[in-house]
Amino acid sequence: MHEPGPPRTTSVGEPVELAPRSPDPDGTYGWTVRDAPADSDLSPGDRPDPDATGPPSSATAVGSETPTAVLRAGETSRDDDPVVHLDPDAPGTYVLALDAPDGTHRQRVRVFPDERREADIRVPVDDLAGNETDPDRVSLLWPHNENRLALDRAERDGDEWVASVRVPPGRHGFGFVPDGDRSAAVHGECEVPGPGRPRVSLDATVVEADDPEESDRLRLTAAVDSAPAVDDVERGGDPDALDAAFLVDDRDADPEAVAAIESQAEGRTLSVPLDDLPDSVRIHAVPHGERYGAAETVRVEADETETDGSEAAASVALVDPNPTPEWAESPTIYEVFVRSFAGDTLPTTFREVERRVEYLDHLGVDALWLTPVLASPTDHGYHVTDYYDTAADLGSREAFESLVDACHDAGIRVVFDLVINHTSRDHPAFQLHSAGVDAYADHYRRSDATADVTGIDWAELDGGAAPDHYFEWGRIPNLNYDSPAVRERLLDVVDEWAAVVDGFRADVAWGVPHGFWKEVADRVPADTLLLDETLPHDPFYGEGEFDVHYDTSLYETLRSIGAGEEPAEAVETALARGEWLGFDDHGAQMRYVENHDEDRYLAEYGRAALRAAAAVTFTLPGAPMIYAGQERGNETYRGPIRWHDGDNKLTDFHRRLAALREAEPLLRDGDVRFDGRASGVRVVEGDADRVTAYERTPPAAGATDGGDADRDPLLVVVNFAAEPATVAVPDGAEADLFGDGNAVERDGEEGRRVAVDAVAVLR
């Protein structure tokens, strides 16, 4: 089936890519508008504009954009339009038809009002002056233009460089880059006041009919929560403005049935007779108010159960169509930079990693994430030259599969680093593309010369003077997802390795279209973990796509705490910011203090702060991640692991954190509270700004994975200071389960006290 996937949601000014699934490169495809909002320039019968191809350029700059086509053709040399880009110009519902080799498919896009607001980013001229000369040009670099240098330019205004932008509310990190030199960039934050995104959860009940002649009804209720207030910039949402939109999946019912079901929604409730439902139907609930949020989806299936007689009682079962694998709900992840893991003498091979699996088991690791293992001319492996062959210096595919088997024997899952946003420019496909071979003409995106800062005299081709790339990454050109041939080949790559490994970490996930990730999520085996590298983390990558996300909010906060720029209590703010962004599930975050792209926390902030930061990652919900060497005292971010001269006490500290997390279900899936007992923690001796406390309590809905929702809450106290802190804790805190602090002592009328070195976990 070439159906284009679920209904899509976006807002005015935020383009969405639409594409057939399981594409046939030799098939013929075409898109036609069936319906559009009254205020849109699109009309029924319209087709993609042949003079506007590919995703639209950055829409962040104010006053510089020219009128854009609402429906753009794909960036290919084909006569048909397999992939199109909708750049909505009005709120409402757009309905499109995809004519494909297997028939006609319906695609709806629900568009909410424009969320962008105007702001000026200003940087003093003196901050960007190098060698006593002013730059000729200054580029704005940030996620809102997909980190493309030279796409948005700042203008000189007196003694400042100014970029006028239009972006959603929030704090947006940016760089002003002089003359394409990112090493000389000035970084800062653009503050755009406004509300966060709402969050939604669904509750379902079957309401029995009073009249036996009538059908029982399915009642879906959307609980919509407004965003919390983080500060004066990232303010809370208006609860009175909240609502939910219910969208029935067009793949599961004909348009008439879809309209009949959706018409029975009233506010946040959808009540439908069971007789009106197909045997299996997916329903998406989208929260919206001042802004819109990520949808939650349920699949409603007929469930014929036998009663005490022989009659079948009509009922339904509700199924999560993209559940997180049970093993991946809260695993301890260990990232290995593959070419440095064996130490400073032996070359790292799959065999050498396999010989050290016992160490991973000893440490308490649940999942091993390996940086790329495929053929590549680089040490880091992110410039892939062959998607089907392992790197020769690491070993054969058989040796890799032997490593996977050894991990499985130890109860450890293996996560594969999937690099499909780009290839190496040494990949044969790019070389053939550059040489003008027709079959590869559409395999890579192209840009005009003004967007290229590499200084390379690229081979001239139709479609653009230079290959498209992010930052100054001229060695890794971006693949073109408008090409059905590219999509087909990369889906084949996913299939190839999904049969071998247990999960994928998606490199530069933010560069690959959402529609493709939705297809991958539906395609891989049900027990496959999907982890996205999206910076900053974005809740829409959890909308039928990824199970776990980089927690960039906590990562940045732990760095700021380590540097003394924020107090330890900013951990609470980091979690609130995740909710403000629109994340509903704390457990869907990978918590980390460093990785292969970042400086070592130990080298930057010291051993005491590292131990505290690591303790935070292990005592919050989510998936704690150790970057190999973090636990051994490594100070170089990609250097060899310190085996013979490593810090064994630091290693044991991490091992005990993993063991305690495994032993205490509340540390894995309990709720987090900063009020209650946590608010009663008081620093008696030590630096109060370096201490934070929070409580892990039984989940509000359902039991813990240990099967006991009545377990006593756990009080976590973390100290980032180099010296121990003595804290007064509320009565009832009897024992330090971690054992890093001294025994809890009674202190007369003052309650109880505990000395906290790095962390205490009290019951």
What are these regions (language model features)?
Residues 114-169, 179-194, 249-264:
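Aromatic-rich carbohydrate-binding modules that target alpha-glucans
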Residues 339-342, 373-395, 400, 405-495, ...:
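Substrate-binding/active-site clefts of carbohydrate-active enzymes
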Residues 495, 502-503, 507-589, 607, ...:
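Active-site-proximal helices and loops of the catalytic beta/alpha 8
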Residues 590-649:
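Aromatic/acidic polysaccharide-binding cleft in carbohydrate-active enzymes
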Residues 680-730:
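Carbohydrate-binding surface patches
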Residues 745-763:
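C-terminal beta-strand-rich structural cap/linker in extracellular carbohydrate-active enzymes
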